[in-house]
Amino acid sequence: MKSLRVVVRRHGGPEVLEIVEDDAPHPASGELRVQIIAAGVSFAELLMREGIHPEKTTLPFTPGWDIVGIVDEAGEGASHAMLGKLVAALPIHGGYAQFICLPEDELTSVPTGVDPIEAVSLVLNYVTAYQMMHRLGHASPGQRVLIHGGRWCRHGSAATWPPGRFRDVWDCLSFRSSDRI
């Protein structure tokens, strides 16, 4: 079976994105293959494509930090229970493709009824918000939290985390958008 993916062979603007056809990958031992339904598009991918992201990438590479798709093949030793399940992952590379093979422990089940496009919008955004809160902000239970622009990024904000996690969660927004509250 053939599959398509995007490849970056040299750094630059969008003109360096090349669509190539290859044989579809098959999962190695302990891996699952995901037929990708949705892939996120982020500023980090733009920086990688241009060669200026702090995490250097070896050329050629397939961009795509975050994906959602259906598990359609299991490698030796991987759980067949995941076959047919909707999953999300943060592979950093390889998401701009029809298929990706990843270690089973890098996949997270997407709850039944959640739209794949909505789900993929949460993967990188949520991880980024979580890291900002905990790695940089050292947020801990009982603290007050201010989220700049949080009203419009609810899915990745502390406001969606378990009730009672923070003492108060405050959103800050501009006067221009205050009529939308």
Label each PLM-derived region with a short phrase.
Residues 44-50:
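Cytochrome P450 core scaffold surrounding the K-helix E-X-X-R motif
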